[in-house]
Amino acid sequence: MSDTDGKKTLGLRGSRPGNVKQSFSHGRTKNVVVETKRKRVVVPKPGAGKPSAGGSSPAGDPSRRPAGISDAEMERRLNALKAAKARESEEAAQREAEEKARAEERERRRAEQEAKEREQREAEQRAREKAEEEERQRREAEEEAKRAAVRAAAEQEAPKAERSAERAPAAARPEGGDNARRTTDRDREREQRQTRGKGRQDGRRSGKLTLSQVTDGEGGRQKSLAAMKRKQERARQKAMGGAAEREKVIREVQLPEAIVVSELANRMAERVADVVKELMKMGMMVTQNQTIDADTAELIIEEFGHKVVRVSDSDVEDVISDIEDAEEDLKPRPPVITIMGHVDHGKTSLLDAIRDAKVVAGEAGGITQHIGAYQVKTDGGATLSFLDTPGHAAFTSMRSRGAQVTDIVVLVVAADDAVMPQTVEAINHAKAAGVPMIVAINKIDKPEANPTKVRTDLLQHEVVVEAMSGEVQDVEVSAKTGEGLDELLEAIALQAEILELKANPDRPAQGAVIEAQLDVGRGPVATVLIQKGTLRQGDIFVVGEQYGKVRALINDKGERVSEAGPSVPVEVLGLNGTPEAGDVLNVTSTEAQAREIAEYRAQVAKDKRAAAGAATTLEQLMAKAKADENVAELPILVKADVQGSAEAIVQAMEKIGNDEVRVRVLHSGVGAITETDVGLAEASGAPIMGFNVRANASARNTANQKGVEIRYYSVIYDLVDDVKAAASGLLSAEIRENFIGYANIKEVFKVSNVGKVAGCLVTEGVARRSAGVRLLRDNVVIHEGTLKTLKRFKDEVAEVQSGQECGMAFENYDDIRPGDVIEIFEREEVTRTLT
C-alpha cells in the first residue's frame, strides 16, 4: 500500500468528515477519520394537553336589572352579551380546530421521523450483515489461496527431486540410495518451511528486519500487525456505513431543584466540556463548578437525548421511610411506662421504691429536673421500662415528649394534695397521646390523706376510676412504706397484656431522643428509647439535624452493651452534635446518606428561622421598632447540662414579662460555660445563667477581667425567681396618691410681691407646704400644682392641722375665688414586681 493512497489535494471546505495524520516514534503514522456529529432531532410526543377555553361569566338575571335602565337599553345589552358569547364560542372552536391541526401535524411529523429512523436502522442492519458476509467470504478465499499455494509448491518440488536423483552416479545408487532419499525429504521440508515463511511477508507486519533485507537495501520499519488490524477494522466499518459504532445509551437522569454542571455531566455520562458547550450555545457562560436551575438542566438533558426524572430535595429522606413489618416478624416487647404528676407528689420516690434505689437523693431540692429512663425487672420476671418526667411547671415540653413515646401513663396524685395544675396537664397529655392511664394515689400513709377526694376531683377532668364505676385503674400506694406497690405492678402488667405490645427486632433501629447533653469527656450524648429494631455498636444513624456512628451504648445501670432492642433506653455516644430532645433516630446504610439527610434538615431549619425573622414590609419593621422603644429588655445567656433543661428554661423565660419589660435569651446551649459565652455576654451586657454546669478556668478569668456576672443554679425555679426579680427592677415605679386634707377658701387677699392669697380653713386632715394641691370649683378640678406659700398669722409654717385657719398662695396661678375648695395630696412611688 503506497503512502499516497486515499489522499487528495488540500482545499477550503466546510465542516465535513476528513482525515488527520498522526505521527509516532520510530517513523510510525496513523490516519484518523474525523466525523461531524449529527444533531439529534427531538420530536415532541403526541397527546399534549389542550388548553381549556376560558368560559365567560354567566349573564345576570334580566329581571334583576339596575334602576333607571329601560327595556330597550336592557335588550340592547343582552343582545351585545349574546353576540360576545357567540364570538367567544367561535374563537374557542377555531382555537380548538387549530390546535387539532397542529396536533395532527406533529403526529404526522413524528410518524415520518419514526419511519425514517426505522428505515435507517434497517439499512444499517442490512449493510452490517452484508459486510460481515463479505468479510467471511474474503477470509475463506484467503485461507483457500494459502492452502492452494502450499499444495502447488509441494507438487513443483517433487519432480525436481526425482530428476536430481536420476542424475546422481549410478555407482553410488546401490550404496547410499536410502540416505539420498532421506536427504531429499529433509530438503523438501526445508523448502516448504521457507515457502511458508515467505507467505508471512518476511516479518513485515511484525516490523522486524533480516540480514538479507538489509543487504538488499530494503531498509526502514514496516507497519506493525496492530496497525494492519486497525486498518482492517476501519475498512470494515466503512463498508458497514458507520453502523458498527456503539449505540448511545439512553439514561434516566435524576434532576434535583439545583445541580452543579459537573455533577450533571457525570449523571449523563457525558464529557463536561460538551455540557458547558451546550450551555454556551444557550447563552449561559458557566463553568463546571457553577450551579444551574432544574429547568435549564432539563433542556440540557433532553438535548443529549436522555430522560429526565425530577426529584425533590426532600426525597433524601425516603431512605428512612417507615416500613410495615410483617405479622410473623413481630415479637413481644416490654411496655414503656411514663410516671407523670404534679411537683412533689412523689413520682421519683415511687419509682425509687419500685427500683429499690435512692434516685431522689441525687436530685437538687428533691425535684426531678431531667427525664430518667430506667428498666426494672419484677419478681415475676417481667421487664418494664420506666420514664420519670419532671412535675415542675417549667417542664411542659418534657412531659409532652414522655407521653408521646410511652405505652402506659401512671398518674401519681398525692392523697393529701389532690388534683393540682400539673396533674391536669398530665391528664391532657395522656389524652392527646391516646395512651391508657393508671392512677396511683400516693402518700396514703399520711394522717391527712383522703383518697376519696382524689377520685372525686378526677371526675371534673373526665377521669373515671374503677372505684367510681369507670374504666381507669386506680391503686392506693405509699412510696414511703411500700404499700400497694405489688398491686401497681400487677395493674401495669395487666394493662400491658391487654395492649399486646409487639415490635420487630430484626430491622434497622428507630427510636426517640428522650434527653441530650454535651459531656466534657464523652462529647454529645443522647438518651434514646429504642422503639423498633435493634441498635448495635457501629451502626450509622441520623437523628434530627445530627448524624453519627454508634461508638458505645450505655444502659441505665452505666454498663456498656453491644446492642439495644425495642423498649430499651440507652445512652448513645458518637454523634457529631447535640440533637434536640424529641428528635427521631433512624439507622441508615451509609454515612453519606446520613450526612445528606442531616444537611437537608439543617438547611430547612435555617430557612424557617430566616423566614420567621424577616420583616415582610418596611412599615412592619418600623412599627416593630417603635413598639420596642417602650419595652425594656433583660438579656441573659443560658447554659444547661442537658437539652431538655435548656429548652425548659428558655420557655420559662418567654413567659416572664409584660408590656413594659421582657426577658431576651441571647443564646441557650448545652455544656460548660466557655470564653465565647463570656465574650457574647460582655458585648450584650448580659449575665450568664448556668444550670448544673460550671465555667472553665479560662472563662472564669475572662469573666473576672471583663466584669461579666456568672450565676450557678441547680433548681430551676430558683433561676426563674432570680430572673423575675431582675426583670422587675426594670419596671418603672408606680405612682400612688394619698389624700391628706381639704381646705375651704373664705376670703381672697391681694398681697404685694406675692399676688393673690387665699384665706382658708382646713376642714379635714392636714395642709402641708410640700404637698401637691388641686383647686376645685363646683367639684370640678380647674388647677393642679404646688403651694408657693403656707402661712399662719404671718409666719411661714410647714403644715396646718384640721380646724385651723391659714393663708395659701399657688405657684404661678391667681384665679382663686371665695367658696373654692383646695384638695391636698401627696405622691409616693411603689416598686412593682412581675407576677
From Swiss-Prot:
> What are the TM regions of this chain, as residue ranges?
none
Region ranges (G3): 388-391
Comp. bias regions, Low complexity: 43-67
* GO molecular function annotations of the record: GTP binding; GTPase activity; translation initiation factor activity
Disulfide topology: none
**A single GO cellular-component term on record:** cytosol
The annotated region (Disordered) lies at: 1-243
Query: Which key words are in the record?
Result: Cytoplasm, GTP-binding, Initiation factor, Nucleotide-binding, Protein biosynthesis
One Pfam family, short name: IF2_N
**Entry annotated with the keyword Magnesium:** no
Q: Quote the subcellular location field of this record.
A: Cytoplasm
Q: Which residues bind GTP?
A: 341-348, 388-392, 442-445
Q: Where is the composition biased (Basic and acidic residues)?
A: 85-147, 157-166, 175-205
Question: tr-type G domain: from which residue to which, for each copy?
Answer: 332-500
Give the matching Gene3D superfamilies: P-loop containing nucleotide triphosphate hydrolases, Translation factors, Translation initiation factor IF- 2, domain 3
**Its job:** One of the essential components for the initiation of protein synthesis. Protects formylmethionyl-tRNA from spontaneous hydrolysis and promotes its binding to the 30S ribosomal subunits. Also involved in the hydrolysis of GTP during the formation of the 70S ribosomal complex.
- Spell out the family assignment given in the record's similarity comment: Belongs to the TRAFAC class translation factor GTPase superfamily. Classic translation factor GTPase family. IF-2 subfamily.
What is the name of this protein?
Translation initiation factor IF-2
Q: Top-down, what is the taxonomic lineage of the species of origin?
A: Bacteria, Pseudomonadati, Pseudomonadota, Alphaproteobacteria, Rhodobacterales
